[in-house]
């Protein structure tokens, strides 16, 4: 624990400032806040910080908490459902998968409920025009004499409760304050037809100043848009024109400062003159930057940008980092070939997955073996995608099997997707993961508006045949609690406005170029072309507005690239080798290499690659997945434990290593620690990950 080093000399009757600014000594409202701070007290019985009063059993229940009035849910009801949905989206709560025995609210905390106080506000970084949500949770178990704080930026594009079951649970159970931010993402759904949007408490509002997000269309522009494209939504992450990812690190740093303000509001020393001494500050408070996926990437960027010494250590899982491209080093797994074409951007590899994966789903060895492939991916659509790709010269071969095999080869060989990811990629395609990321991030990076309808894509509810319909009022009323922030989600789908016939849900749309239901491949190829800067079918450079948008997207991607400079902060990454959403050859692995190139022997980053683990633990509750894969969540909590021991007891972090887990083989066999060997303090030589000779070497 850091020793207390106050910048004040406290006498009998006076406080004398030494070398500190006044706002560093006395508690003051951060100037980046753009709203009042809302405070809520939870007793740990009827309601609480972690489970919203549901307890461990309620979170595990397949029946979500209901609203008394489906059209007018209360803020408390929306919060409860948001916590329920966000917890279950990140943590496998199915029986036998480790919930309740290895992790979960009641593990190490009998009731599972955590009393305390919650503070919510809106904030902005300099230059931004759209607010970001920030929240601090302070459990009753927080000890002001030994203060600690954990960051919990939301994973994915989720809202303010998006990290409640990951960094939130670990930090609250540790007695730490937990600071959250939605990173400028979250639901933020502006119904352009009704002009309603979500307020900070989740209820619908028509007041611009109360909304989480509204498209910057004046009344006439909105009417004109609605007359041509009725019942559409603008979404905060996609359409705010802010490229929020460029500021994710700053959002996390601001959330920490907000946390210090709230902690001193509660525990600072009142001096009797209207001032409160900041007795809890970065010098005496242990701060771990954490979270998973996009939230993990945000905390990594925060550590890189930390100029005030706010962060002591970093512990993240499967972080979405876009490392700066550095070809001075390569990556090699086992005796395989050295990979130099690493560090592709999220939009680059995601648009490739969006284009080719639908065909690769039909490859021999994949189509009948990949879990849930037949359930989520109609074979006829996959075959049409293959046929369209072949007709455009994008795959080769004599048969549909050949085309599908070539699509898989392209992803593995040309785009560096690990073979371990191949069996999980089909279910992700069926869940529209790559498609939704490609659409949202192309808009966000290019700072496009809803009115631009990039690649002819928009967002709306659709009926059974795929045609656009108004979103049901009850569904809209619950969007704050039900949506993951990146459609298709909670009844709002991706719509291909240029589909043959009429605007149609992308998944069942026919491309004009093929007249086949090929998942709107023309739209996906358009997104791919924007990522490359050339028409991927003709090979010709983009022209006009498309070329300008590509340049804007390229600038947006450059703004989110990570530097690799962690400022020597102790850092832990845990990542599953089978991650089929954020391929490890473009995220965690090259970040480790970049960090070595930047920090060298001064690096304190450790990388633990977990075999038989992937990105979405929630899928482990399904047959074919839970029997093959283990929860990465378990190792994320172990990473946090290791970081805690490093910062409090000076325990050394274990060397970088591959962790060889043992899948349980059947969902009827409960997961135990025998399946989950710990990260070793002294791993075998055959398991060590090393950087030598400008190469990151990873054992098979």
Swiss-Prot record:
Keyword Transcription regulation on entry: no
Q: What is its main location?
A: secreted
Which keywords appear in this protein's UniProt record, sorted alphabetically?
Hydrolase, Secreted, Signal
According to the UniProt record, one GO cellular component term is: extracellular space
What family does this belong to? Belongs to the D-(-)-3-hydroxybutyrate oligomer hydrolase family.
Checking HAMAP family in the record gives: 3HBOH
**Protein name stated in the entry:** D-(-)-3-hydroxybutyrate oligomer hydrolase
Q: Which organism is it from?
A: Marinobacter nauticus (strain ATCC 700491 / DSM 11845 / VT8)
Provide the taxonomic classification. Bacteria, Pseudomonadati, Pseudomonadota, Gammaproteobacteria, Pseudomonadales
